[in-house]
Amino acid sequence: MTTFSPREIVSELDRYIIGQHDAKRAVAIALRNRWRRQQLDPSLRDEVMPKNILMIGPTGVGKTEISRRLAKLAGAPFIKVEATKFTEVGYVGRDVEQIIRDLVEVGIGLMREKKRAEVQAKAHVSAEERVLDALVGTTASPATRENFRKKLRDGELDDKEIDIEVADAGSGMGGFEIPGMPGANIGVLNLSEMFGKAMGGRTKKVRTTVKASYTDLIRDESDKLIDNEVIQREAVRATENDGIVFLDEIDKIAARDGGMGAGVSREGVQRDLLPLVEGTTVSTKYGPVKTDHILFIASGAFHVSKPSDLLPELQGRLPIRVELRPLNKEDFRRILTETEASLIRQYRALMETENLNLDFTDDAIDALADVAVHLNSSVENIGARRLQTVMERVLDDISYNAPDRAGAAITIDAAYVREHVGDLAQNTDLSRFIL
């Protein structure tokens, strides 16, 4: 759990997302409140519930990206789901409890990586011994082993090929659910894991270079040093206390006027979400998981429906409302130049792999922003995603011919941008299909 202050969280988000200060503030406060809750007396800690957030704004303005970056910053189990993928219990499709099961799986992965990092130094020593066994055999004299160990550490043997035995991660068959007990996935996979542990696990022989072998061997040795039960227990605890669920497209399950047909099923999904957001216990193959303190961030464009079309009970469980504004020309300009991995920086780096130097003038950046704003207003507003379409169109020729122009320096100016997308941008009918 991060100890960043709300101000530090916002400045961290500013590196990747332009504008939307209100939304950043809301998620920063929500994340800081999780840390504050952990400092409380246990008797009061259980009473402090997370304040779930509803983000309202058009597509491509940063709703998903804010949540994704927040989860990465927090180092917390995070899952993004589309509300439209779920159906009411009894219908064909995924039921909403699967969200929590998937979140626990993410938590297990995070915890396993954390534990592996803790034992990496020990695992590296064991991995080195296994590489030496592969190089000189187990019966070699101590002097020979030390001689090869020195060469190994100096990198002299990095490209030598060796045969190593590593755990066979692909062994075993999928489990099956016990009827009437969703989530209790006790099956062949679990049985094979149990027998695997008893008999030392299944292995496979792999031929690889000395340098490349370390990745598999360190992972293998790390897994021998960590306790799976501890991982599962701590992952469930982390999921319950720090987990973040991002519910996208929630406006698509808002009931509209005339409550027949699909609308009834949409309302059913909302009713199924209620206990999850309010706090319930979900059965998973790692044990029961309480959802009381999981933070839910819902988002939607609400073009056709409005937040008040959601069930009143669900509205009440999303107390913090944040509106994200549409992007203007200045925002597009900043997205192209100021973000940590801006599109211009990405394309420059891609072309450098072909030994091609790509440069954009200030008026080219203005022209790109102009075209994106014009297309969003005249065709369909898809926010910052429009920039990717425009950039691909502008750089199409350069990308195609890059291998033949190695060593060249290309400067893109406003005239070049207009030449490649100007006509299409002006012709609205064509733009609808091409840009």
UniProtKB/Swiss-Prot annotation:
Location relative to the cell: Cytoplasm
Domain of life of the source: Bacteria
GO-annotated biological processes: protein unfolding; proteolysis involved in protein catabolic process
Main location: cytoplasm
Record's keyword annotation contains Magnesium: no
One term under GO cellular component: HslUV protease complex
Pfam families: AAA, AAA_2
Molecular function, one GO term: ATP binding
Keywords: ATP-binding, Chaperone, Cytoplasm, Nucleotide-binding, Stress response
Binding site for ATP: I18, G60, V61, G62, K63, T64, E65, D248, E313, R385
Keyword Ion transport annotated: no
Function noted in UniProt: ATPase subunit of a proteasome-like degradation complex; this subunit has chaperone activity. The binding of ATP and its subsequent hydrolysis by HslU are essential for unfolding of protein substrates subsequently hydrolyzed by HslV. HslU recognizes the N-terminal part of its protein substrates and unfolds these before they are guided to HslV for hydrolysis.
Family statement: Belongs to the ClpX chaperone family. HslU subfamily.
Name of the protein described by the UniProt record: ATP-dependent protease ATPase subunit HslU
Provenance organism: Rhizobium etli (strain ATCC 51251 / DSM 11541 / JCM 21823 / NBRC 15573 / CFN 42)
Lineage, top ranks: Bacteria, Pseudomonadati, Pseudomonadota, Alphaproteobacteria, Hyphomicrobiales
Gene that encodes it: hslU
